[in-house]
Amino acid sequence: MAITKEDILEAVGSLTVMELNDLVKAFEEKFGVSAAAVAVAGPAGAGAAAAEEKTEFDVVLASAGDQKVGVIKVVRAITGLGLKEAKDIVDGAPKTLKEGVSKAEAEDIQKQLEEAGAKVEIK
């Protein structure tokens, strides 16, 4: 019996975030492609205006500090990940936790993580 697209979608839908990450890496290796987003060139002169009015920020966990357990709990609350995935992120710091969030949300996440003992960067 042949595997259908629905079978594949069902199987992919049941994977964890870490398993999906491994799957993407396997596709990249097997087919020699990259899953990285392609940057689109904007109109000339728009770069300076965009740099002045940055509205989207990335929250990066620089290090977990001494209170790793507390940081893992906060990472789980922020990202909605499971315990293992959150622990892997904390252990693998520096890692980007959230991308494209507002300045207020980025500062709130930074405050929560720093209260738990982590070092955080907003980019």
Swiss-Prot record:
Q: What CDD domains does the database record attribute to this sequence?
A: Ribosomal_L7_L12
Mind telling me which InterPro entries this protein's record contains?
Ribosomal_bL12, Ribosomal_bL12_C, Ribosomal_bL12_C/ClpS-like, Ribosomal_bL12_oligo, Ribosomal_bL12_oligo_N_sf
> Can you quote a single GO CC term?
cytosolic large ribosomal subunit
A Gene Ontology annotation in the biological process aspect, one of them, is: translation
What NCBIfam families does this protein's entry cite?
A: L12
What does this protein do, in the record's words?
Forms part of the ribosomal stalk which helps the ribosome interact with GTP-bound translation factors. Is thus essential for accurate translation.
In terms of HAMAP family, this protein maps to: Ribosomal_bL12
**Subunit organization:** Homodimer. Part of the ribosomal stalk of the 50S ribosomal subunit. Forms a multimeric L10(L12)X complex, where L10 forms an elongated spine to which 2 to 4 L12 dimers bind in a sequential fashion. Binds GTP-bound translation factors.
Protein name as annotated? Large ribosomal subunit protein bL12
Protein's organism: Neisseria perflava
